């Protein structure tokens, strides 16, 4: 894994953690870790974490 891909992976896992533990919606979590665009963050979540943000949140 390249350094850039690893950095993206860390950022996306922080988005996931904030959604699960802090009960942030995907937009708030994405902006909190530095994403500036909702479509880009959703696309990265889908590509790197292999799930849509709706699938991350419980119930």
Curated annotation (Swiss-Prot):
Gene3D superfamilies given in the database record = Homeodomain-like
Q: Where, if anywhere, are coiled coils annotated? A: none
> Does the record's keyword annotation contain Transport?
no
Domain of life of the organism encoding this protein: Bacteria
Name one molecular function that GO assigns to this entry: DNA-binding transcription factor activity
**InterPro entries with a match to the protein in the record:** HTH_AraC
Q: Which residues form the HTH araC/xylS-type domain?
A: 1-59
Residue ranges flagged as DNA-binding region = 26-49
Q: Which UniProt keywords apply?
A: DNA-binding, Transcription, Transcription regulation
Identification of the protein by name: Putative HTH-type transcriptional regulator YneL
| Naturally occurring in which organism (per UniProt) | Escherichia coli (strain K12)
Phylogenetic lineage: Bacteria, Pseudomonadati, Pseudomonadota, Gammaproteobacteria, Enterobacterales
Q: Which gene encodes it?
A: yneL
